[in-house]
Amino acid sequence: MAKRSEPIRKSVKEILDDLVAGHQEAAYGGPEAALKYLRRTFENQGSLPNAVKAVAHDLMADAQAQAGDWEGCAASAATALGHLPDLEAAFPHEYRRLLAGFASFERGIQAHSELGDFHGALELCERAMALGLGAHYEAKRDSLEWAR
């Protein structure tokens, strides 16, 4: 009797690498193609690791901003940022590098501003500053101070 082959189990890093590579390829077709790829990934991957979900939602927020879907962008950015602890737990040595490339802060601030939710934009500026992501978030916060 033939031995049943074991299912292929990928590491979180391998799953993340596959997601990023697939997204890069899809993004050549524009933000709509990137969104289609990411939506299919969520539909077909029933159990993406939460750390990978952080990056997937971050990529989705960026594509939604490019497409002008501000409500979707704000929601995706919030979801991505909600998974940051999972990202840090899965990639403790790469977390700062991954965080530096995260678009969710920038795109979330943009989305909240476009939607007229300046308090939401301010909160994201404060959160980015607390994580030490750069002085430009302090400048953004200062430009939104009037909304307090």
Regions flagged by a language model, labelled:
Residues 63, 111, 131, 144-148:
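TPR/TPR-like alpha-solenoid repeats
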Residues 49-51, 84-92, 130-141:
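Boundary/linker segments of alpha-helical solenoid repeat arrays
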Residues 6-9, 42-49, 129-131:
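Solenoid-like repeat scaffolds
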Residues 75-85, 117-135:
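TPR/TPR-like (Sel1-like) alpha-helical repeat modules
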Residues 52, 72, 95-103, 133, ...:
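Structural signature of alpha-solenoid helical repeat junctions
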Residues 26-40, 70-88:
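Helix-turn-helix repeat elements of alpha-solenoid scaffolds
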